[in-house]
Amino acid sequence: MEQREQPAVQVPSLDGVTRERFLRDVYPRREPVVLKGMELGPCTTKWTVDYLSQAAGSKEVKIHVSAVPQMDFLSKNFVYRTLPFDVFVRRAAEVKHKDYFLSEDEKYYLRSVGEDVRKDIADIRKQFPVLAEDVQIPEYFEKEQFFSSVFRISSAGLQLWTHYDVMDNFLIQVTGRKRVVLYSPRDVPYLYLSGTKSEVLDVDNPDFEKYPLFAKAKRYQCYLEAGDVLFIPAMWFHNVISEEFGVALNVFWKHLPAECYDKSDTYGNKDPTAASRAIQILDRALKTLEELPEEYRDFYARRMVLRIQEKAYRNDNG
């Protein structure tokens, strides 16, 4: 298996960014930035394992459990289990477990959801109201743009696969340390997508024989310490490793007008409705091309690609 180390571009960090400066200088650039020195409330010092266990109590939560650190959405190398929150958070903070589902060194991951996952969004104020009182969310967007606030807890070493979201978001690292690797939306041709996720699971040691184009993807990287906030614009791919047991909060908001999004989307990962319709139309067009012999199909497919490039690609060199 051919492997090559990819150089990384460090995501820039800014200290003490106000709402006004963010909206004027940062947000229009549509690039990731680490925001330091943000006022987040007492959560960064208060959220110990003992406090979390006591504050959220025995509320049952559905969690991911994996016998290996690198979670794989292709082979589904994890299972879903339900635990009382206080039991879960203590297990997630452990390295070796006396009680376990798969193995004594299994990893745990919580991604909070709404009461009815088909209809309700994740909102820390509703699912974990006591904890929500400890958090001051940077409201660098209008209230009507707010979509969800997702509470996350990860075991040390857990790695989530590379994916994109269709909403802008702040990844607020409350406790612990994370490494985040990101890829620009413009590198989508090199990421071997399956839906919203990249099939290149190991971004540190990719199999270039299987995924040769991945070598062309420009890697951006940052490390988040407790109290850091990472701005991830919509459609930027991100891969996250929890280097320590940690607690985080994702705050998603709508960059586009509300009517552009799928109203049935409770996770923030369904493509905008116009994009979904366009992809369906393209699929029908490709089906129509199958009526032609291969030589003609190839010719007209290339013309279609040129038409898309001329009409839909941005014409700058960014």
Swiss-Prot record:
Its cofactor is Fe(2+). Fe cation binds at H163, D165, H238. It is an enzyme of class 1 (oxidoreductase). Transmembrane segments: none annotated. Its EC number is 1.14.11.42. Disulfide bonds: none annotated. One of its GO terms (biological process) is wybutosine biosynthetic process. Residues 126-270 form the JmjC domain. Binds 1 Fe(2+) ion per subunit. Pathway: tRNA modification; wybutosine-tRNA(Phe) biosynthesis. Homodimer. tRNA hydroxylase that acts as a component of the wybutosine biosynthesis pathway. Wybutosine is a hyper modified guanosine with a tricyclic base found at the 3'-position adjacent to the anticodon of eukaryotic phenylalanine tRNA. Catalyzes the hydroxylation of 7-(a-amino-a-carboxypropyl)wyosine (yW-72) into undermodified hydroxywybutosine (OHyW*). OHyW* being further transformed into hydroxywybutosine (OHyW) by LCMT2/TYW4. OHyW is a derivative of wybutosine found in higher eukaryotes. This is tRNA wybutosine-synthesizing protein 5. It comes from Gallus gallus (Chicken).
